Structure formats: structure tokens, C-alpha cells
Amino acid sequence: MQKIGIYPGTFDPVTNGHIDIIHRSSELFEKLIVAVAHSSAKNPMFSLDERLKMIQLATKSFKNVECVAFEGLLANLAKEYHCKVLVRGLRVVSDFEYELQMGYANKSLNHELETLYFMPTLQNAFISSSIVRSIIAHKGDASHLVPKEIYPLISKA
């Protein structure tokens, strides 16, 4: 059976920090599913289709990465793909508190599921999608924070 990991997120928009985690985690799995969440509760700036297109463009050079959109429980998506490992990023202490709760919740729904946490590299530690959204909303230049393939798409927002 293939070793499969799932890296879920809203990716609104995808950042260099996300790509760094995709790069590092894709080396640990035969297949990495990047799962773009519907996340209507977060009121995303970009539509699900736009976010999926952006992540596909940004990951096209990764041979073992597949990008999918999903709605519903992540634990169910993991079962669908026969995945036993979730990949998550931790930038700050508050991320850990949230991710720990989510990890326990996912484990309670799917007992085979483990969560693997990645700390960002130093140059990406401060980057978040919300910072990028704020910069582009104020007509600033966020090109150094996102993959070059997607900057033309987000700079029009």
C-alpha cells in the first residue's frame, strides 16, 4: 500500500510557507494530497475553484502531489484516500493549541489517523495567508510571499 499524506488547508491564497511544507512533506510520502477546503465559515477572498487553480499552478513541478477540493470532514477524506497521516504547519504557539485540538478530533473520528507537524523555515515563519490578503487589499506588493505562478492571479483581487 502506498504511503499517502494529506496536507489540508484553505490556501486563501497559497503562500511560500505552504509550498515549503509541501516540498518537505512530499519527500516523506509516495503521494501527497493537497486538500483545499471549502471553508465557507472563513469567508475566503478567493473562490474554491480559484484556490484550487492556484495550488495546482504552484505545485505543478511536484511529481507526487495531487491537489483536490473537499467539503466535509477531513477524517472522511483521509479514509477515502487510505491515508493515515495528516500534515500541518505550526508557526506560532496559538497554531499549536488549535492544531492539537483538531488532531485529537480527527483521531477520534478516524483512529488510524496521525498528524505530522512541520515548523516553518525561518524565512517563512511570519508568512500567513491573512497577511498576504491584507497586503493585496491595500494594493501592496506581496510578490515575495507567494509563488511567482500565482501572483498575477492574486494581484488583481
Swiss-Prot record:
Impact when changing N76Y: Forms a domain-swapped homotetramer
HAMAP family per the UniProt record, alphabetical: PPAT_bact
Species lineage: Bacteria, Pseudomonadati, Campylobacterota, Epsilonproteobacteria, Campylobacterales
E.C. number(s) listed in UniProt: 2.7.7.3
InterPro entries in alphabetical order: Cyt_trans-like, PPAT, Rossmann-like_a/b/a_fold
Any one GO MF annotation of this record: pantetheine-phosphate adenylyltransferase activity
Protein name: Phosphopantetheine adenylyltransferase
Pathway the protein takes part in: Cofactor biosynthesis; coenzyme A biosynthesis; CoA from (R)-pantothenate: step 4/5
Cofactor(s) annotated in UniProt: Mg(2+)
S-S pairs: none
Magnesium among keywords: yes
Complexes and interactors: Homohexamer.
Residues at which ATP binds: T10, F11, H18, G89, L90, R91, E99, N124, A125, F126, I127, S128, S129, S130
Organism field: Helicobacter pylori (strain ATCC 700392 / 26695) (Campylobacter pylori)
Known regulation of activity: Tightly binds to CoA, which is presumably a feedback inhibitor. Potently inhibited by D-amethopterin, which simultaneously occupies the 4'-phosphopantetheine- and ATP-binding sites; following treatment with D-amethopterin, H.pylori exhibits morphological characteristics associated with cell death, showing that D-amethopterin displays antimicrobial activity.
Binding site for substrate: T10, K42, L74, R88
Gene: coaD
Catalytic activity: (R)-4'-phosphopantetheine + ATP + H(+) = 3'-dephospho-CoA + diphosphate
Major localisation: cytoplasm
